[in-house]
């Protein structure tokens, strides 16, 4: 506007200024030709001046236009620069915002993972503690059970040792008091004498039974003794008038009483007082007598034999083998009404008759008292120990009254 305003303003001024007559106070000359020439020169000078001004104005206007164009270009460049800088800043801001969001999400994921891992670790720790407690409980139960078993075994061992000591002490005390009645030199000779006595027809040996309180070691000991007994004794044949024995053995070791208590033993009045005997005599009244060998009682044999348990004694096969090798148990038949029981020092009840008692009294002067039972069988694999037992039986007492 300024450039065009100045341009049009100058034109208006040029139009507004008419050619006026210049006043001059100089004197007129008398030469008119000189005046006209001077006047034309002046006009030429004015035109030159006007042309110079116009050229200057045009140059100035062009310069101003260039300046305006440069200013506009500068403004445009500044705007471009501003716009460019704004885009970069926005992109940077967007990138920073995205980075912030990613960092926040990453931090949140890390927090969630750490919390979950802590939960899993605490859960695993609780499970491990529970497993350790369970293992401790199981081990404690097993240890307590083993300790209880060991204590029971120790108690059983102590009881057995006490019984063995008591048995040895009673044996020593009995050996210090020798008996008055002696066994004959051989069981066969004594048996021949007893057979001649018809009145002494029945001999019944019954042990005291405590089946509910016997120990496994005692049963194995008695099984071994019974096996040795079968190998020791050989039995001759008997007639119909031969003696028979009713054996009720409980397979439990018992202790012999001391000689001081032998006089105070209780003697039952009759055979019918025994429930074991009553159950066995019911079916023996109408049959004929069988020819059966004489079998010694296990408890009587135990009185002279040692205690030698066998680790195979508690098995069923061993018991069946022993039962198959042993003689069958006899039944009581035709007991006389005057017969009775008498108890020996081993705690057994023996059947006797008055005639047999008189015969024993007659033989007591000669020191004859013995054991009269031998079983009919083979003397299989008789060892040195069995021979020693045979010699021991031939030189030691068996019954005491």
From Swiss-Prot:
Domain IQ: 105-133, 134-156
Subcellular location per the Swiss-Prot or TrEMBL entry: Nucleus, Nuclear body; Cell membrane
Gene Ontology molecular-function annotations: calmodulin binding
GO cellular component, one term: nuclear body
Compositionally biased region (Low complexity): 165-176, 278-287
Pfam short name (any one): DUF4005
Positions of the UniProt region annotated as Disordered: 1-48, 165-186, 258-296
Record's keyword terms, sorted: Calmodulin-binding, Cell membrane, Membrane, Nucleus, Repeat
Region Calmodulin-binding, residue ranges: 105-121
SUPFAM superfamilies listed in its UniProt record: P-loop containing nucleoside triphosphate hydrolases
Gene3D superfamilies: 1.20.5.190
Protein family per UniProt: Belongs to the IQD family.
Assembly: Binds to multiple calmodulin (CaM) in the presence of Ca(2+) and CaM-like proteins.
Role noted for this protein: May be involved in cooperative interactions with calmodulins or calmodulin-like proteins. Recruits calmodulin proteins to microtubules, thus being a potential scaffold in cellular signaling and trafficking. May associate with nucleic acids and regulate gene expression at the transcriptional or post-transcriptional level.
The protein, known as: Protein IQ-DOMAIN 24
Species for this entry: Arabidopsis thaliana (Mouse-ear cress)
